[in-house]
């Protein structure tokens, strides 16, 4: 009896052991088909926009129900941007035309978050008329002197469409919407047999301590820089230049002991807004830049500033791309280009190269 009982226990233990071994084998196979990337960059560099592009490119885009859910975000972004400009006027020594005083009061009386299926007519009319005011347009031209969302002008120019009956946000409306990222989000998509996992972390300073949870076993880092913010200050600390902050962050990530051999895909983002700022003097913010208003020279200069920070050039490669994260076709092209790079890195990581 004792021997039979013992054999039964042994059989159960062996079955459990075999099950664990089989699961470990399955996990190893899955790991070989999985590419993990960590998405990094300072606040408002375009990380969340890239993730939205992933959904458009690899997940079939947004359903009408999902698009409808973005209305409140888009309406709120639009009103918040107008309020930011109105609040900045006194410091800029600018004023509205007297006829717009009542419209100013209308916008300032609106709550920060708009919870409505349709943009109220009085708010839409106020935004439309204020956007035609010369003083307000001059404030937008000087937006580097205060905090203003990149999407402000786009939404102001779209106010007729956004306030029309039956409005449903377009892909471009959604791409330009802004919600501060907090915590860690994971985006997964498949290309062929490979599964890509992209981890996004909050870009603001207060969120960076959370990045450590994503550090292990990533195939590559995707680091975003907003080129257009070379003349702007941080949201959290208006004494710190945003480009200098991005350089400091890139330095700390690139040369971290966690990433000695981890390659970096560098997105030099917002090239469209960067080009619009060409008349602005870069030498004010980077005295060693001597390229004047030349776009290519400015791009090359900033690329060199980042790449030159790499202290492990022998073991770490930096792959740079100039991007406009709101341009789906361009991002699709860039993603296709880096998939080959990621595959090579992954095969090397798995010991298959």
Swiss-Prot record:
Occurrences of domain G-alpha (ranges): 33-353
Cofactor names: Mg(2+)
Positions where lipid (N-myristoyl glycine) attaches: 2
Location of region: G5 motif: 323-328
Molecular functions (GO terms): G protein-coupled receptor binding; G-protein beta/gamma-subunit complex binding; GTP binding; GTPase activity; metal ion binding
Annotated region (G4 motif), positions in chain: 265-272
Keywords from the named record: GTP-binding, Hydrolase, Lipoprotein, Magnesium, Metal-binding, Myristate, Nucleotide-binding, Palmitate, Transducer
An annotated GO cellular component: heterotrimeric G-protein complex
Annotated segments matching region G3 motif: 196-205
Function text: Guanine nucleotide-binding proteins (G proteins) are involved as modulators or transducers in various transmembrane signaling systems.
Subunit structure: G proteins are composed of 3 units; alpha, beta and gamma. The alpha chain contains the guanine nucleotide binding site.
Protein's UniProt name: Guanine nucleotide-binding protein subunit alpha
Gene source species: Coprinellus congregatus (Inky cap fungus)
